[in-house]
Amino acid sequence: PGVTVVANQKTINMIKQFFDFDIDARVMVVKEGDVLDTGKHKFTFVMAPMVHWPEVMVTYDSFDKTLYSADAFGTFGAINGKIFADEVNFESEWLPDARRYYTNIVGKYGTQVQALLKKAAGIDIGMICPLHGPVWRTNLNWYIDKYHTWSTYTPEEKAVLIVYASVYGDTENAA
């Protein structure tokens, strides 16, 4: 009814492809760097195409210093009542699923993730709210560094992978 859809042009085009209703009268198209001032909050829109989907943008609220990061910085797993990353032992309980999430959801778009990380470096971020997984309010640089490592395809540990097939076990013994 009285709703305004705030989205970038690519998102509007996609909505029109999937839904049959007049959206033009209810839309505010935003682009890179645009600011939506609601009084207390000022939302800045930052394009992050292919950080999972082609139309992705993240939103930064300068009042709360919160980055609404869409699929970036997300993870698989159930929250179970603890919505903040500092309320769980993230490194031991969540990091494997965060790595798997990165690999499966945005892993092939390392260049685009790097572009987003460069944009984010110039923003005073106090909290990261991804679409999936816990909210980050402490130790943000640790998790941002993980994304840097993963998006540059830098090995986290030194290792060697030995791939073999062994019908009778001799090759397995040699490996």
What are these regions (language model features)?
Residues P1-V5:
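Active-site metal-binding motif and surrounding structural segment of the metallo-beta-lactamase
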Residues N8-K10, D71, V163-V167:
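Cofactor-binding loop segments of dinucleotide-utilizing enzymes, especially the Rossmann-like FAD-
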Residues T11-I15, T75-F76:
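Short gly/pro/ser/thr-enriched loop/turn and capping motifs at secondary-structure boundaries
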Residues M14, W136-T138, G169-D170:
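Flexible loop/turn segments at secondary-structure boundaries
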Residues M14-F18, N173-A174:
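Short alpha-helix adjacent to the SAM-binding motif of class I
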Residues D20-E87:
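Catalytic core of the metallo-beta-lactamase
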Residues S62, T66-L67, F73-P96, N104-E156:
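Divalent-metal (often Zn2+) His-rich catalytic cores of metallo-beta-lactamase-fold enzymes
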Residues S166-A175:
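Redox- and metal-dependent alpha/beta enzyme cores, enriched for Fe-S-associated oxidoreductases
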